From Swiss-Prot:
The gene is pepX. This is Xaa-Pro dipeptidyl-peptidase. Keywords: Aminopeptidase, Cytoplasm, Hydrolase, Protease, Serine protease. Its EC number is 3.4.14.11. InterPro entries: AB_hydrolase_fold, Galactose-bd-like_sf, Pept_S15_Xpro, PepX_N_dom, PepX_N_dom_sf, Xaa-Pro-like_dom, Xaa-Pro_dipept_C, Xaa-Pro_dipeptidyl-ppase/CocE. It comes from Streptococcus agalactiae serotype III (strain NEM316). The lineage of its organism: Bacteria, Bacillati, Bacillota, Bacilli, Lactobacillales. GO terms for cellular component: cytoplasm.
Length: 761
């Protein structure tokens, strides 16, 4: 374990003393540090009346137990504090450590010892070995009662709301859209979980089209074959129009007011929401139009879908109507809500957070968007090509519609509405235009970057630099396009398409607690969070602070002095093997074992580089045909320690999200010896070589120059590292698998790579 603490708010000695006293610790400024430490320890033994015995189980040095020490006349030393602090945080002497000073240095322990009250205060805010902060562990053990009132420590809300007395209710929010032309405004089902309290409370909202169920068989049947011919496109310039977001018309309802009349017993929850539920935040889960319990069509990513989530925030602020049932005869008021909302969730869920933020909806104070899509074209297409998300060849937006249109899982809904749904789905399948892979109005209507200037909320993004599902370009684009007037924060980790709130190496939960206590509960805690926090790829459990995602300087590296050819065609056996399992293709590609058609360029580095942003390939090429795919990957190649991309369990169910509530595993990315690491990649239709909206003809055997931007990353490279560039045509994981007989020739003497860095790095 190594500490990377971003959540602690520096506290003065007097303030620390008052907070400790407020928690019930019997401290006294007139007493010695030794006496105050003993009082602190005895009060911490919440489940033991025999505190002498508890003290006797702690040690203050390699030979003395704490009870003996406190009965002696020995002075308190720094070494004594170090031994005790480590034990309070769950580290075991003679097992986890023998030399506390060296061990504390190794784990980057953040606590100082200048003042006993400041020191104990900071200690309480530190995570233990199990992942829980000491204060959270003590509250769970009974330091404070679950009295359904707010209590704070170091600017963060504590788990003092009773999760055994939760209110679970369902309401149906009306939106001013009729997405299936039914003659009525659509209704959106909202599942609410909230503590029983006299306070008006803020809301953690997860907008999840998955939460009311998914239709895997329908999606599997809709999934496309990737084998086919790459189209030769007619030259043209694509025209699109940005449509203003339409604010819905709001009419106060005159219906009688009623409490919610529908309840539920269980819904799959997001554990970060659970963490805040025990701290006085309501949790709501909304699946939006076209899902089970709601009405309407699954419009998949456009602002109609976004509006179905926005209406829920408007209801929390008293602006639109929610009904007790589909009868629409009684309305429900959100009289428990303070109107302030934070959205949460990963992937599609985080995507809806971004879309919501771009509406500028009142009441949305914070989005915590993890691995979020910023424009749907970049999820299912790339540079004029159909480009499946990593791991899901053949998926497309209409496949996702089939997966998430959960109304068809309700038989009565199916027989009434499936014909209309199928007609709308067919229209969607035509609009996505798999034949050309081009950008069009349909995709433009699902591009949140066009409305990013409307964002008013505070923004938190997390993204994996090994996420080839929702690729890093999504967060790179939106984060750098956000208005300068807002506060924004970005956590970039070395994993794939995963959550990071339950990792051992970073206090993400506690940082979000400080931020949301500030923004949603109005606590003036002076919390400041850095803009870009990046997981260092060279060292285990180490996070660094950077000024920006994207460097201000370009380093140029030549690619060679010869001309090399890439053949697209494979014999039938090889082609069928790669189509059957794209992982076999990737393995052969990365090994460079002459089984795949590729150009491999090894670039031994002559100095250190902190790669920060989008690498670009500047290539002089010619093709033998009027069509061609060019794919590229950049690898850090050669044996050394690197991160795996999926976190593994450190301790099972050790993370407590309240008082023994919604426990989950503590995780971390393994750091092990490996042969290579993909840094970046990309694919390009050579007919889209100038920009996305320009289609150009290819003249066979005529040289032309291209600039090819790859996926952005932040990656530390060292002198002597081998940077491997692989150029090839068909990517069997991502692109159309066209086995046509064409080739691409690259003039390496006229080609080079640019690496984005910070000036002086």
């Amino acid at each position: 374990m190594r500490y990377n603490q971003f959540s602690y708010i520096p506290t003065k000695p007097n303030e620390a003393f008052e907070e400790l006293k407020g928690l019930g610790f019997p401290l006294n400024k007139k007493n010695s540090d030794k006496a105050n430490l003993e009082a602190f320890l005895r009060h911490s033994f919440l489940n033991q009346t025999d505190t002498d015995y508890a003290l006797s189980l702690l040690i203050v040095d390699a030979k003395t137990d704490a009870l003996t020490f406190f009965k002696s006349n020995s002075d308190l030393t720094l070494e004594n504090l170090q031994w005790i602090y480590l034990q309070l945080l769950g580290f075991v002497p003679f097992v986890d450590f023998k030399d506390p000073k060296a061990f504390l240095q190794d784990i980057n322990f953040p606590v100082s010892y200048d003042n006993i009250f400041q020191s104990l205060h900071h200690l309480l805010a530190c995570r233990g070995k199990s992942g829980n902060t000491l204060i959270d562990q003590l509250v769970a053990d009974g330091l404070l009662h679950a009295d359904n009132h707010y209590h704070f420590f170091n600017g963060k809300s504590l788990a003092t709301f009773n999760t055994n007395q939760l209110i679970r209710e369902v309401v149906y929010v009306e939106i001013s859209l009729d997405t299936m032309s039914s003659g009525e405004h659509d209704l959106v089902k909202v599942n609410i979980i909230r503590p029983t309290t006299e306070h008006t409370i803020p809301t953690m909202m997860t907008a999840s089209p998955y939460h009311q169920g998914i239709n895997d068989p329908a999606a599997d049947q809709k999934t496309y074959q990737m084998e086919g011919a790459l189209a030769v496109k007619q030259p043209k310039h694509i025209q699109v129009d940005t449509k203003p977001f339409k604010e819905e018309v709001k009419h106060p309802s005159k219906l009688p007011i009623s409490p919610a009349t529908e309840s539920f017993t269980h819904i799959d929850s997001y554990s970060l929401n659970d963490y805040f539920l025990s701290r006085g935040f309501a949790n709501i889960y909304v699946s939006g139009v076209g899902t089970a319990g709601s009405t309407g069509f699954m419009t998949s990513g456009d602002y109609q879908q976004i509006q179905s989530f926005k209406a829920v925030i408007d209801w929390l602020n008293g602006k639109v109507t929610a009904f007790t049932s589909h009868k629409r005869d009684k309305q429900v008021k959100a009289d428990w809500s303070n109107g302030l909302v934070a959205t949460t969730g990963k992937s599609y869920l985080g995507t809806m957070s971004t879309g919501l933020a771009t509406t500028g909806v009142e009441g949305l104070k914070v989005i915590i968007a993890e691995a979020a899509i910023s424009t749907w074209y970049d999820y299912y297409r790339e540079n004029g090509l159909v480009c499946s998300p990593g791991g899901y060849p053949g998926e497309d937006l209409d496949v996702l519609t089939e997966l998430t249109y959960s109304r068809n899982l309700l038989a009565g809904d199916y027989i009434k509405n499936n014909d209309c749904y199928q007609a709308l789905l067919n229209e969607q399948s035509k609009a996505i235009d798999r034949q050309s892979g081009d950008y069009n109005q349909y995709w433009h209507d699902r591009n949140y970057l066009t409305h990013v200037n409307n964002v008013k909320s505070r923004v938190v993004y997390t993204h994996g630099l090994q996420d080839w599902n929702v690729k890093p370009r999504h967060v790179y684009k939106v984060f750098n396009a956000l208005p300068q007037t807002i506060k924004k924060h970005l956590f970039l980790h070395q994993g794939q398409h995963v959550y990071m709130h339950n990792w051992q190496s970073i206090d993400f939960r506690e940082s979000m607690n400080a931020l949301l206590s500030q923004e949603l509960l109005g606590i003036d805690n002076h919390f400041q969070l850095e803009e870009v926090i990046w997981q260092d790829n060279t060292t285990e459990q180490t996070w660094q602070v950077l000024d920006a995602f994207g460097g201000n300087h370009q380093e140029q590296i030549g690619l060679g002095d010869s001309k090399k050819l890439i053949d697209n065609h494979y014999d039938k056996e090889a082609f069928d093997t790669y189509c059957k399992d794209f992982n076999v293709f990737k393995n052969d590609l990365f090994k460079g074992n002459n089984k795949t058609n590729q150009i491999t360029i090894n670039l031994p580095l002559k100095k250190n580089y902190l790669l920060n942003g989008q690498c670009k390939l500047h290539l002089r090429v010619k093709t033998s045909d009027k069509k061609a795919i060019l794919s590229a990957q950049i690898l850090d190649y050669g044996p050394k320690k690197r991160f795996k991309d999926t976190p593994t369990i450190k301790f099972l169910n050790s993370l407590d999200n309240g008082k023994n509530f919604a426990r989950e595993a503590l995780r971390e990315l393994p750091f092990t010896k490996d042969h290579y690491r993909v840094i970046s990649k990309g694919v390009l239709n050579l007919q889209n070589r100038t920009d996305l909206l320009t289609i150009e003809a290819i003249e066979p055997e005529q040289w032309f120059d291209i600039e090819f931007s790859l996926q952005p990353s932040i990656y530390q490279l060292s002198k002597g590292d081998n940077l491997r560039i692989i150029l090839y045509t068909t990517d069997f994981e991502h692109t159309i698998r066209d086995n046509a007989s064409y080739s691409i020739t690259v003039d390496l003497s006229q080609s080079y790579l640019t690496i984005p860095t910070n000036q002086g790095n």
